[in-house]
């Protein structure tokens, strides 16, 4: 069953630009994980310190393995340097309903 993950990470003031490479490098590694179908970060157009998270995993096991991966744990530690003040990330089980565009 497909797992969708969406959320936000609010970084400290002025930290978005400083953290951009960390996010890009991490996404490149995660995209090679088995079961990763989509993994991206986007900086909000109105707030450059707000990061939007979008992920799609083939199944819950793939998402679970991702959470235990050494590079994911290292990313979490590195993220602390950018003073995250709030994080909200949720997962849903889902299936493709229809193509909109």
List the model feature ranges, each with a label:
Residues 17, 48, 66-74, 95:
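Residues at secondary-structure transition points
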Residues 25-38, 56-90:
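An amphipathic, aromatic/His-enriched active-site/gating alpha helix that lines ligand/cofactor pockets
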Residues 3-10, 40-67:
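Short, well-ordered beta-strand segments in beta-rich or mixed alpha/beta enzyme
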Residues 10-19:
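Short, surface-exposed ligand-recognition loops at beta-strand->loop->(often short) alpha-helix junctions
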Residues 2, 42-49, 77-101:
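Glycine-rich beta-strand-turn "strand-cap" elements at beta-sheet edges
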Residues 7-8, 69-70, 95-101:
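Short flexible/disordered coil segments
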């Amino acid at each position: 069953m497909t797992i969708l993950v969406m959320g936000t990470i609010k970084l400290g003031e002025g930290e978005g630009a400083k953290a951009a490479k960390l996010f890009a490098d991490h996404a490149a590694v995660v995209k090679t994980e088995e079961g990763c179908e989509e993994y991206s970060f986007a900086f909000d157009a109105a707030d450059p310190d707000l990061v939007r998270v979008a992920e799609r995993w083939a199944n819950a096991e793939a998402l679970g393995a991702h959470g235990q991966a050494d590079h994911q744990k290292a990313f979490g530690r590195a993220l602390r340097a950018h003073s995250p003040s709030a994080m909200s990330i949720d997962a849903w089980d889902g299936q493709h309903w229809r193509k909109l565009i």
